[in-house]
Amino acid sequence: METTYAHIKSALLLLAVAILTAASARADTYSWTNFQSDIPGVAQHVDPSLVNPWGMAVSPSGTIWVSDNGTGVSTLYHQDGTAVPLVVEIPTAARNRDVGNPTGQVFNETPFFQVTKNGNSAPAFFIFVSEDGSISGWNPTLDQTHAIIAVDNGTNRGVNRAIYKGATLGVANGHNFLYVTNFHTSKVETYDENFHQVNPNGFFDPTLPAGYGPFGIRNFNDEIFVTYAKQDPKREDDVPGPGFGFVNVFDTSGNFLRRLISNGELNAPWGLALVEDGLWVGNFGDGRINNYDPVTGAFIETLMTADGTPLEFEGLWDLLPLGDGVFFTAGSPTKSTAFSASLRKIKIGEHESGSSRIACTAFGIRPNANLRGKCCEVHA
């Protein structure tokens, strides 16, 4: 797990054009525009905090919150790509001597999942999980610019070490629960409304091959979708590779329902989104977005560029459908830089179905192989 970011180089929001080639031979056009960068003159706006943006959540007002894994903060954006003048610092686990490293996050609209500071408690409106084993929550009445630790499993060592990669919320038997992917222990952890861990035997798939850990997680229509990535020898980070991945579906009580997708086009999958009638699965491993039937898991298509090559965003993380758009986040494999992009899709040609449009935002980078582990170059 990489937690040192000595060479933060660039973050960028951009717009371009691509074409999606589907199995039905329909033609879909994508375009995107430069919104944000930490390099002056590259985009419309500059944001030095946008480094390895990972999970996203949206507030009731429509503001997008982004977990910046590389800088240990959450940055906020309007849906037109402009920044909101609030940066929330994500706390670290007690053993973490570096900056925070948030990954997944969720918006909490319940009165539960309270955090406490100076003897005062309030519900965490946003909940963050981090690679250092911490879970934190933010409520502006307690601290406007800092999230507050709710769970610190960063002190766990050995087989019980916690490395959190994703989170989602759900309701089971009338109670609210937080579900967190612990990549190191190969378990999905469940927390009750008071941040107490429960259901230790839930989310078990007896047929899952050894060496895979839960990676991304989403709640779709009261079913918990979990992606799995191949683990490195220390079980800290994913190992990319063609076919390295699975997607399972559980109920909100942690009971296994079905294996949805096995291997195939998966490559360290993390991002999940229901878009139109399909399930978009974003691969961190190769940066591709694949579309599947959300019920059967049947492969439908890979999003393609105009020249017939797969549309790729290096280090692709989250997928967030919002309004008429799907927002993407991505960061470098070295986690030292990132950029964002807005992507708009318009259906064209004789296979056009209605007049629907999808606008998308993507955050991605292409690393310089010679600088791996130090810094990355951005290639538009």
Language model features: what each stretch is:
Residues 360, 375-376:
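Cysteine-centered motifs
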Residues 5, 339, 360-363:
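Aromatic (phenylalanine/tyrosine) cluster motif
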